Swiss-Prot record:
It comes from Buchnera aphidicola subsp. Schizaphis graminum (strain Sg). The active site is at C2, K603. This is Glutamine--fructose-6-phosphate aminotransferase [isomerizing]. The lineage of its organism: Bacteria, Pseudomonadati, Pseudomonadota, Gammaproteobacteria, Enterobacterales. One of its GO terms (cellular component) is cytosol. It is found in: Cytoplasm.
Length: 608
């Protein structure tokens, strides 16, 4: 969602600020702005609605120079999309950019209005700026002291960076539920909501932890924890290559990321599968501590990660013989919970910053779970920091809003984990060896399916003008149908629904006619014959069917079969999503949609 970039240096930082927020465009935004302190110690602010390129043109006309500044991309939560609501927000000598939501902003706004403050925007961010100014005027304290005290009055999950025209040598950063990272330079330092914004200038980072306040200057950084005690945070060296965030030969990031899946899966397997055994060095003794005694698994996630969790439920129960419940994170947090005995709490998230999932994790800590594990793509993320242990997917940077390689690498990690647990609990002989061997071949099998792209392009041309599409799947293919429908909705804006094939007669069959195509995934498994019956039911009612299968299926009228290379049943969910990703991509491409930044959506949803 919103993006923050800030810098304090000994050189002009205007170009850096603009380049930084441009790198954060993938997170989703509707407006952007920046503020700097000029040579007269005044704050200069420039804002606009629309793309960062529009802001760039406005800034270039001003010919600004400054050693300190902050910039922001806004995704509207409080107040409509307008220049007046665009960050940064100013109160006298104080400028603020902010991610997240201040839940008690209305109460604070009324308080400040009574004190004589005039609001020019509808945002909760302007409330922060005026509150800091009021507190400093009242007490005469330094801005750092004011921020440390004032943050206790701000309810909600947020992060902010504050700039003071009366002290132009430093920036102040606060993390309270929303991520911030400090980039370390030589006689210069940087702040961002995502390391991607900083990768072209540094590989050295410090991730602020919950409740931290940081004073960032050119030559030093002081960090205070939630108790306002000075503390040293660990420095991390990123191994992410800057060139990996370029599209290269591909038209869109989503296309690039679909075709990166063989290498992303291979990276996820590397150093974890050796001589037909699976090893997670990250877990250490927690592997036995959590899972040997586990009698239940509770997984929470959102969006694509939720669909990966849904697939894993079938694996947990059929392989490890452990009951598994999967719930959407926002729903988990919204009800009174009855926790099973000896249950392990697992979260899935690409970014590790999904607000709903973080909220669920924080609630779980009070409920008596054996422990918490997160499966995540970002090592320094909040979920990684706040969980008892973590497993990284190693998918690499994913920029397209519609997740692709994070889904298949999540499933890869989950299947390895379940194989380890199955062996640990002595449920099935040789299951670890079998799955290790199958997964070792997975990257090449993904490559084989990607070679079907010409067929899928043709299919996309047939479907691109449809208003509604129905996806069906049985067993562990039902979550794949859900993910296929989600991908199509996200980037093509075609209405798509997914149902278990067995539910067809319980309502969805009423929708079947020649205008609603039905897409079915039908790998060889024990449910294939039942799926064939569903196909006949649809054809008998004049439906149009497209079947992805590795088996020969008798052709019916108005039926198209897209042949998929044979795959082992256990990894069919990982492989059958690939053609559905391609299908969604090529349909959106033919419709001319903004594939990497679909309307109203953000890559990392950091507000509840």
């Amino acid at each position: 969602m919103c993006g923050i970039v800030a810098a304090v240096t000994q050189r002009n930082i205007i170009d850096f600020l603009l380049e930084g927020i441009k790198k954060l465009e993938y997170r989703g935004y509707d407006s952007s702005g920046l503020a700097i302190i000029n040579k007269n110690q005044n704050i200069v602010r420039i804002r606009c609605v629309g793309r960062v390129n529009k802001l760039l043109k406005k800034v270039k006309k001003k010919k600004l120079f400054s050693n300190i500044g902050l910039a922001h991309t806004r995704w509207a939560t409080h107040g409509q999309v307008s220049e007046k609501n665009t960050h940064p927000h100013i109160s006298s000598h104080i400028a603020v950019v902010h991610n997240g939501v201040i839940e008690n902003n209305t109460k604070l706004r009324h308080f400040l209005e009574k004190k004589g403050y005039i609001f020019y925007s509808d945002t909760d961010t302007e409330v922060i700026a005026h509150l800091l100014h009021w507190e400093q005027t009242k007490t005469g304290e330094s801005l750092v002291e004011v921020i440390q005290r004032s943050k206790m009055k701000l309810n909600g999950n947020y992060s902010m960076v504050v700039m003071d025209a009366y002290n132009s040598s430093r920036l102040i950063a606060v993390r309270s539920g929303s991520p911030l990272v400090i980039g370390l330079g030589i006689k210069e330092n940087f702040i961002a909501s995502d390391q991607i914004a900083l990768l072209n200038i540094t590989k050295r980072f410090i991730y602020l932890e919950e409740g931290d306040t940081a004073i960032v200057e050119t030559k030093k950084i002081n960090i205070f924890n939630k108790n306002n005690l000075i503390i040293k945070r660990k420095e991390i060296t990123s191994n992410v290559k800057y060139k990996s965030i370029n599209k290269g030969k591909y038209k869109h990031y989503m296309e690039k990321e679909i075709y990166e899946q063989p290498i992303s899966i291979q990276n996820t397997l590397n150093n974890r599968i050796k001589k037909d055994t699976i090893n997670f060095s990250e877990l250490g003794d927690r592997e036995k501590k959590f899972f040997l005694n586990a009698e239940h698994i509770q997984i929470v996630a959102c969006g694509t990660s939720y669909h990966a969790a849904m697939v894993s439920r079938y694996w947990f129960e059929s392989l490890a013989n452990i009951p598994c419940d999967v719930e959407i994170a926002s729903e988990f947090s919204s009800r009174k919970l009855a926790v099973r005995k000896k249950s392990v709490f697992i979260t899935l998230s690409q970014s590790g910053e999904t607000a709903d999932t973080l909220a669920a994790l924080r609630i779980s800590k009070k409920l008596g779970y054996l422990g918490s594990l997160t499966i995540c793509n970002m090592k320094g993320s909040s979920l990684v920091q706040e969980s008892d242990c973590y497993l990284l997917t190693k998918a690499g940077i994913e920029i397209g809003v519609a997740s692709t390689k994070s889904f298949t690498t999540q499933l890869t990690v989950l299947l390895m984990l379940i194989a380890k647990i199955t062996k640990l609990k002595k449920q099935k002989n040789n299951i670890e060896k079998k799955i290790a061997q199958i997964l070792s071949l997975l990257p090449s099998k993904v490559e084989a399916i990607l070679k079907k792209n010409t067929l899928i392009k043709t299919l996309a041309n047939q479907l691109c003008n449809k208003k509604n599409i129905l996806f069906l799947g049985r067993g562990d293919q039902y979550p794949i149908a859900m993910e296929g429908a989600l991908k199509l909705k996200e980037i093509s804006y075609i209405h798509a629904e997914a149902y278990p094939s067995g539910e067809l007669k319980h309502g969805p069959l009423a929708l079947i006619d020649k205008n609603i195509p039905v897409i079915i995934t039908a790998p060889k498994n024990s449910l294939l014959e039942k799926t064939k019956k569903n196909i006949k039911e649809i054809c008998a009612r004049g439906g149009i069917i497209y079947v992805f299968s590795d088996q020969e299926i008798d052709l019916e009228k108005n039926m198209t079969i897209i042949k998929i290379p044979y795959v082992e049943e256990i990894i069919a969910p990982i492989l059958y999503i690939i053609p559905l990703q391609l299908l969604a991509y090529y349909i959106a491409l033919s419709k001319g949609k903004n594939i990497d930044q679909p309307r109203h959506l953000a890559k990392s949803v950091t507000v509840e």
